[in-house]
Regions:
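Serine-dependent carboxylesterase/thioesterase catalytic core
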Residues: 5-103
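C-terminal catalytic-base region of ester-bond hydrolases, centering on the histidine
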Residues: 101-200
Length: 200
């Protein structure tokens, strides 16, 4: 459990300790799956300490959830900080570091459903500008991507949907060909969007 601590500084320190404890530099290759805050921590770690054996990264990208820290701080600042600590404030205004070097193969999993908190904060999220779902615009250097009918909370538990595509990307450098490369709906805030049944 590297993420998240009470602040981004504490979280970065936890990641350094994790990397040292497990001697990441000794592996032939390091492949990572990064969620939103995790991408910030990995990028800052690589920028400061380097990780030349990092070969592949799959990013969870959410056009709605990536606006959550700022949206919460705009509307519920005291509640947000009380619930999640100073890390929420940190994430709402931090300068995002550059991604790893071009030799690192990047894949994207793009969420197409807003969480319940982001449905409450829809007006704040939309006020920040258009929501971009074209994966080649989200990350022009990404090798491949696919879209999911999941929200950010589901991304932590729906490995029945995520597991095989991630393993396929790590083995072949691309996601399975039958996965959707285009956005799945016009309104990610629509709570009536169908949720996939659990695959057992």
């Amino acid at each position: 459990d590297v993420l998240l601590r009470k602040s981004l500084d504490d979280s970065s320190a936890a990641l350094r300790e994790f990397a040292q404890e497990y001697h990441l530099e000794d592996y032939a290759e390091v492949k990572a799956i990064c969620y939103i805050a995790g991408a910030y921590l990995m990028h800052t770690y690589v920028a400061e300490w380097g990780l030349p054996n990092l070969s592949q990264v799959i990013y969870d990208r959410s056009p709605t959830q990536e606006r959550a820290p700022r949206a919460v701080m705009d509307r519920f600042p005291m509640v947000g900080v009380l619930a999640l600590g100073p890390v929420l404030r940190d994430l709402s205004n931090v300068d995002w570091p550059e991604p790893p070097a071009a030799h690192v193969l990047r894949g994207l999993m793009v969420e197409n459903r807003a969480t319940s908190i982001m449905r409450i904060l829809e007006s704040e999220a939309r006020a920040m500008g258009p929501l971009e779902y074209n994966w080649q615009k989200i990350d022009p250097l990404a090798a491949d991507a696919f879209h999911l009918p999941l929200d950010h909370d589901m991304m932590y538990i729906r490995w029945d949907i995520l597991g095989e595509p991630c393993l396929h990307f790590f083995e072949h450098g691309a996601f399975p060909a039958d996965l959707p490369r285009e956005r799945l709906n016009d309104n990610p805030f629509d709570k009536s969007l169908p949720i996939p049944e659990v695959v057992r």
